[in-house]
Structures are given as structure tokens and as C-alpha cells.
Amino acid sequence: MNVLLIGTGGREHALAWKIAQSPSLDTFYATTGNPGIAKLAKPADITVTDHAAVVRFCQDNAIDLVVIGPEAPLVDGLGNSLRAASIAVFGPDKAAAQLEGSKGFTKDLCARYNIPTARYQRCRSAEEAKAALDNFSTPVVIKADGLAGGKGVIIAESRLEAEQAIQDMTAGAFGKAGLEIVVEEFMQGEEASFFAISDGETVRPFGTARDHKRVGDGDTGPNTGGMGAYSPATRLTADLEKRVMQEIVTPTVQAMKEQGMPFVGILYAGLMLTSEGPKLIEYNARLGDPECQVLMMRLESDILPLLYAAATGKLQAQPEPTFSKDYAVTVVIAAQGYPASPKKGGIITRLNEAEANGAVVFQAGTTLDNQTLKANGGRVLNVTAKAADFNAARDLAYQAVNVIDYPDGFWRGDIGL
């Protein structure tokens, strides 16, 4: 099978690492920009926003399957363009990607189909959002409706803080993403991430994880795209997983089909485990980053037949994905100044030495400059390890982190605690 992978982050490096292991793989191409992926796949020098160029590349190189990693191309409708050219795509089309692209769309869908989630109000102006605060106690959650790189959610401890967040969002702090706002009740409980793979009709569980969003130890500082993760999510028991499938995930897939926008790809449910049971915080229309990294470390099934079956409506014929009983832990090394203004250009060495204990270092915000590896983004490296015991996996990951020489980097010391 000839495969094209779209995306250049740590998530895509983990996907590439797993795809490259598949016996079903013939030729593997990936978009350029990640030195780690470049070791595994041939370069596809294409601009992802130029859909015609992507289609042409697929036709010229007899691509059997396109795997889209990040959310932006999904929401931009790249899947639609490829499907229109009869190219199999793993990832939803533009309409179905609204599950991530518009928080208001998802909340309305939940309300219509009785999918458990927090009480909310959609607001189309700062005035409307500020007035909506009268209907909520603090803390209250203020969300930008659109894509904001994992940073468009503010938990406001006071009304003043909530009004400031509303003001910032409507003034363009997250670009067009904040033109509409969702005001939401704050849910008490523990967070967990639940993943499912769907072909638009059939849906199967695809592992669980827990990520750490805040930049600092002890869950302090601003939200980020994620500073680390572990899998499985220990609080998600088999009974809870069954409830999540029955009460949240399966009804969503059925609802999307009924709405005429079948969801193909990975459905990532961000959950709050409340005293009343699991409730949906939000959906993502793709694998999480860095949750993908821990899931790929644990996935035992050959990934390509799964992705291709989902892309071609044949998931029913595939056996359930199997995951190792081992634990996996990812620690993100970020550039100083992240998330506000990460310092670029820092030199990174000793990655091979870091992997000597069995850890895998997935590259994210990196670039090669005359064979010297340098930081080129906020989240730079994702150091991932697996072991039969949770603490052993954690120790292996941190041992590898401490071997890497990257003076401009920092990380949280409490991932998994």
C-alpha cells in the first residue's frame, strides 16, 4: 500500500513510526518539515492548503491512502477534495470535522441527542456572552468556538476574569476562532481522553489516555497543547469505557450519520468523570498530541489495515484494535518561553543516547540546519517510554529526558503523578 501522511508534528512522527512498521506498507510519503519523519518516509514537497496540488501528488504517486494528522487540514476540507478525486482518506470531511472546528456545533448536537455534557450557552457577541454569565456560577468556562491550537479555553475563577476572557476572545486573541463564544458550566471531576475509530457507521474503541494541559508542575500556568500524557487512563475502568461507548461515542457517530455527515477517522472524546458519570467536555476530530504518542507505543495491531478499513467503510470486517497491557508515558520538552513566545534556534543533541534504554524520542518543533538539529517551535520533543509497570515507564521516560542535551528546553517533572 502506498501511503501519504499529512502533518509535521510529534503526533505525526508517532503515526509515521507506527505506519513504517506495517507489513502492508509499500511506499511511504510524508509532508516535509519534521526531521524525525524524514528518516521514515520519502518527502512530499507539497503545500497542504493547495488541495489541487495534494490531489495531483496522490495521482502521480499512486497513493492508496492519505492519513491526515492535524485538525486544520480537516476543517479546511482537504478530505473532501481527496474523496472527490476517489482517493481514500483517513480523517473526516469538512462538515464532520465541525465536531472539533465548532464547539457550539458539538454542544447543540449533544443537546439534540441527549449526549451527557455541561450546561452551556452559545453567544455571538461580547455583550451576549457577558449577559450569559448571569446564568452560571463561578468558576465558569469560556471557550472560543473555533480552532485555537488547544489554547482557546479559559477557566475563569471570577466574573471579572470571565468578562476579560470574553473581551480578549472577541477582540481577536484567537483570530476568527473567538468570534463566537461558548459559555459553559464548570464540571468537577477527573479528566480522561477516550479514542474511537470510525468508518462513518461502525465505531470501535481505540485506547485511552490522560494528558497534562497546563505548562507548569502542579497544573499551574496557562493551558498548552499538552505537556505530557500517559496511557491507559487508569481512572477509566472497563465499566466506564462501556458507558462512554454507549452513552457518548456511539450516539455521536449515529447522530452524525443521521445528519448526513458521517464521521470517518479518529473521534477523540475529552471526558470529565463526574459523580453523575462520564460527560463530554469536547470532541477532537483526530488523535491527540501528545496522546497519540503513548497510544502508538501501546498499539499492537497492524495500523494500516485499520486506517484503510475506516477510510473505505469496511471497519466491521476488521478485528478490534489491540493494545499492550503495558503503560506508556510521554514527557514533552518545550522551548523556553512556551506557550507565549518560545525561543527558537536552540541546539539539540544526544537523541540516540536518550533512546538507548528503549525510549523513543518523537520530534515536534525541530528543524535540521546543516545537519544540526535545532528547536523550531514551542513543543520540541516528545520523549516516550513503555513498561509493564506505570512507575517504571515514567522512570524510563524521565531518564531519557535527562540524557538529552538541549539547554533551552524545559519540561514538567510531574507527568503521571
From Swiss-Prot:
Free-text remark on how the cofactor is bound: Binds 1 Mg(2+) or Mn(2+) ion per subunit.
Pfam name, any one: GARS_C
| Residues annotated as binding ATP | 133-193
Q: Which UniProt keywords apply?
A: ATP-binding, Ligase, Magnesium, Manganese, Metal-binding, Nucleotide-binding, Purine biosynthesis
What Gene Ontology terms describe what this protein does at the molecular function level? ATP binding; metal ion binding; phosphoribosylamine-glycine ligase activity
Q: What does this protein need as cofactor?
A: Mg(2+); Mn(2+)
> Would I find Metal-binding among this entry's keywords?
yes
Q: In which pathway does it act?
A: Purine metabolism; IMP biosynthesis via de novo pathway; N(1)-(5-phospho-D-ribosyl)glycinamide from 5-phospho-alpha-D-ribose 1-diphosphate: step 2/2
Q: What catalytic activity is recorded?
A: 5-phospho-beta-D-ribosylamine + glycine + ATP = N(1)-(5-phospho-beta-D-ribosyl)glycinamide + ADP + phosphate + H(+)
- The superkingdom of the source organism is Bacteria
- Matches recorded under SMART domains: GARS_A, GARS_C
Instruction: Please list the residues that bind Mg(2+).
Output: 282, 284
Q: Which residues form the ATP-grasp domain?
A: 107-312
**Region annotation Disordered: where it falls in the sequence:** 206-231
Which InterPro entries is this protein grouped with?
Answer: ATP-grasp (IPR011761), ATP_grasp_subdomain_1 (IPR013815), PreATP-grasp_dom_sf (IPR016185), PRibGlycinamid_synth_ATP-grasp (IPR020561), PRibGlycinamide_synth (IPR000115), PRibGlycinamide_synth_C-dom (IPR020560), PRibGlycinamide_synth_C_sf (IPR037123), PRibGlycinamide_synth_CS (IPR020559)
Enzyme Commission numbers on file? 6.3.4.13
Q: What class of enzyme is it?
A: ligase
Provide one Gene Ontology biological process annotation: 'de novo' IMP biosynthetic process
Q: Belongs to which family?
A: Belongs to the GARS family.
Its name, as the record gives it, is Phosphoribosylamine--glycine ligase
